[in-house]
Amino acid sequence: MKLNILRLLVVTLACASAFVVITKVRAEKTASSITPTLPQPAQQPAVTAAQQDKPTEQVQKNIKVLTGLPQWQLIPVMNYMAASMGRRCNYCHVNNNGQWDYASDDKQEKNTAREMIKLVLDTNKNTFKGNVEVGCYTCHRGRSQPQSIPALPLPVPSPGGGQRPGGGGPPAQGPGQQPQAQPSPSASPAQPTADDILNKYINAIGGTAAIDKIKTRVMKGSMATANGQTISYEIHQTAPNKAYELFTTQRGSMERAVNGETGWEKNPQGVHELVGQPLADLKLSLQLFRNIKLKEQFTRLRFGGRDKVGDREAYVLNAGTADNRRERLYFDAENGLLLRRVTFTQTIVGVIPEQIDFEDYREVEGVKLPFAIRVSSVDPGNPISTRKFDEIKLNAPIDDSKFNMPPKAATP
């Protein structure tokens, strides 16, 4: 017991400068992300698609403690560390007049970070049997230095709402007093099953017959980022496994598509075929029925209690997939609509969440669909982005050539 406590105390220092070396990389999102990878500054050329599944030490320079981390997880892990400490890249990395030297070890903060990451890895390995129970956020909670002393004054407990100082249980009885009757707990309402919740959702959005009529979907609108930038966005989807999306920004445009088992991306740096984890991510996120036919996506579903999403009471489902991805789904307890979807990506230094909120449901040809989708992530540069659609069309014709990969530019 003392050993466990000691290790947990040690971890309060963990990730104090938790950034490691990155050299010129482009952000790739987590496995369930629907947030776009936007064109990156010229200073950060893209890592090739073939490199994304390689260990990061085979792609980047001077990686010392995150050996074995897949390259595609590197940017999400960096974002997780930054969010955990409320810091940005320059806390650990060298920037000379706007030029990043990610491989440099000149800053002591980065060297300290390596030691702290080792402590996190060791604690999870030796205390929690290899499970990732402790991460940077465990202690930092958005601060560069963990707070180890309680802040005074402490919150005042509500009358009758807490235990007596020094222990729990009912109040002590005086001499000759009879024990006071304790109120019996109120009966808990019957818990719905996972099937109850999912069936109610299907009926709420229009029913199986209406859903099965959907063959294509075209959505057009805009995406607002956390820094106030507005990006034009559109997506074209054909069942069962084709999709194309276009982002238009002030810096240019970006296209991404899935055509069955293949995928590609076109940005200002050129056309790239997607393979490995980035392709799997895109195939998952662009599925036409991704947020409609939920039951088929999971091998494990169980009721997770009640919660609130905004001012709405919600039922929660804890879900798991065949490849051990975990998600949490929130459904409006009254009308049955899907309100929120939280996905979790496990890495060697912590579990990275992403939250997707669905709002402004409207009926389109007999099916209710959200016209606003808000994505919250641990990306410090864009923690919240909101997509709002001006139009959604079902079963509109889509030219199949839209999903084909464009020819690559000739090499000079």
Give the ranges of each region predicted by the language model.
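Sec-dependent N-terminal signal peptides
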Residues: 1-28
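Sequence context surrounding c-type heme c attachment/ligation sites in exported
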Residues: 32-197
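An anionic, turn-rich surface loop/hairpin at beta-sheet edges
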Residues: 103-113, 277-285, 346-357
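Edge/loop elements at the starts and ends of beta-strands within beta-rich repeat scaffolds
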Residues: 190, 210-215, 228, 349-351, ...
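N-terminal mature ectodomain segment of secretory-pathway/periplasmic proteins
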Residues: 196-271, 296-308, 321
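Gly/Pro-enriched, hydrophobic low-complexity segments
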Residues: 250-252, 310-409
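Acidic/charged, solvent-exposed loop-and-adjacent secondary-structure segments enriched in E/D, K/R, S/T
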Residues: 264-290
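Short, conserved active-site entrance elements at the starts or edges of catalytic domains
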Residues: 281-318, 337-340
